[in-house]
Structures are given as C-alpha cells and as structure tokens.
Amino acid sequence: MKDWLDEIHWNADGLVPAIAQDHRTGRILMMAWMNRESLALTVRENRAIYWSRSRGKLWRKGEESGHVQKVHELRLDCDADVIILQVEQLGGIACHTGRESCFYRVFEDGAWKVVDPILKDPDAIYRAGHPHE
C-alpha cells in the first residue's frame, strides 16, 4: 500500500504549497509551505503546521498570536502539487498584518488597493521583534 505522503508531488526543496481556506465562507486566508513533517503533524494534531522557509523550522500557526487554524478537511489538487486546508480560523485573523486574510489588496485601475481593514494592531498580537510589515 502506498503511503499517502508519497502521493504528493513535492517540489525540489521537498515542499508543497498549502492554501488555507475558511471552512464556512470559502474565503482564501493565506498561502504557506508544508514539508512531509509539517503535513504529517497537521494531520496528527488537527491544526495547521507549516514549514517556515525564512526561519527554516516548523511553524505552528498561532504559536505566537493565538490565531490557530483548526483543520476540518484537507484536499489535494489534480496534479497532486497543491494542498487546500479547510480551516476554522480561531480569532478571525490569519494575516500577520492583523487582517482576516493575507489577500487584502485588490487590483483596481492599475494599482493595488487595500480593501480589508486591520482587525487588530499587529503590535498587540505579536511580541517585540516579530517581522510584521
């Protein structure tokens, strides 16, 4: 029997893009990367755990902010190279900028326009030194 992790087409760095989507509304919240370990832990712990390329380590979403993503369903695309996580976003904030979604800008009239409000000041979410904006 084939291991379910072996069915995924990992990129040259051993990563796969993972899109977090609100399980109720369908809104795309964010995109991050997963490796085999983070995906296996996500399934085991039923919460989103990503691979931070900038920090070179596992990133348990919400470990600093408290904005944990509880996983309701995982989906693999037809090419087996993108994962969607249907999540419940605790605290209603997925983005390190303090917004609901990382996709808060719309292309309009030749420019990117911010259309979503900041729900909570990032300085109030993260301790000093966190690289937000």
UniProtKB/Swiss-Prot annotation:
Entry's localization field: Cytoplasm
Pathway involvement of the protein, from the record: Amino-acid biosynthesis; L-histidine biosynthesis; L-histidine from 5-phospho-alpha-D-ribose 1-diphosphate: step 3/9
PANTHER family documented for this protein: HISTIDINE BIOSYNTHESIS BIFUNCTIONAL PROTEIN, HISTIDINE BIOSYNTHESIS BIFUNCTIONAL PROTEIN HIS7
Cofactor(s) needed for function: Mg(2+); Zn(2+)
Chief location: cytoplasm
Keyword Thylakoid: no
Note on cofactor: Binds 1 Mg(2+) ion per subunit.
Function of the molecule: Catalyzes the hydrolysis of the adenine ring of phosphoribosyl-AMP.
Protein name, as recorded: Phosphoribosyl-AMP cyclohydrolase
Encoding gene (name): hisI
Catalytic activity annotation: 1-(5-phospho-beta-D-ribosyl)-5'-AMP + H2O = 1-(5-phospho-beta-D-ribosyl)-5-[(5-phospho-beta-D-ribosylamino)methylideneamino]imidazole-4-carboxamide
Family indicated by similarity: Belongs to the PRA-CH family.
UniProt keyword Magnesium, yes or no: yes
